[in-house]
């Protein structure tokens, strides 16, 4: 019958396990973050398709708005949340789409940019987004109304403005600012201006 493990043997096994974890953990965390980015991009793509469908069915200008200002009551919203709303032809907020609530990106994932050209990927200026004015939600915003970035679909199903490239990637909102991480490895959601078609890609 084999004797019990000695203290030295147990310590050796634990040491080996710690070394293996130290080697594999960074790779595991990187893989997990990458999966979160891909998941967020697909969720946004699906939501954009639903918003477009609502616009066509109800014959109303309908937008997916992202919180891109700092006039908020909680830091959980900027660059990490989105919601469907109805706007008019001048991009002015009218009301929230019935039964729609704020939805959030996976932890550690944000919308890094909305560009209107592939050359403008990830500049962080949101130049390809529509500015939706008079957005109102007393439970979210500290101001009575705000202006936020979004994608607007006309009642015909095509997009207000030029093609839009939504850049989803790693990042966080801290100390009143959006901090982007690993910008070379982002997921792209493309919305075609003329057809409203939503497609995916990577930078």
PLM feature spans:
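N-terminal helix-rich module
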Residues: 5, 23-49, 53, 61, ...
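Positively charged n-region of N-terminal signal peptides that target proteins for export
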Residues: 1-3
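Alpha-helical hydrophobic helix detector
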Residues: 11-27
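Carboxylate/His-rich catalytic cores and anion/metal-binding grooves
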Residues: 8
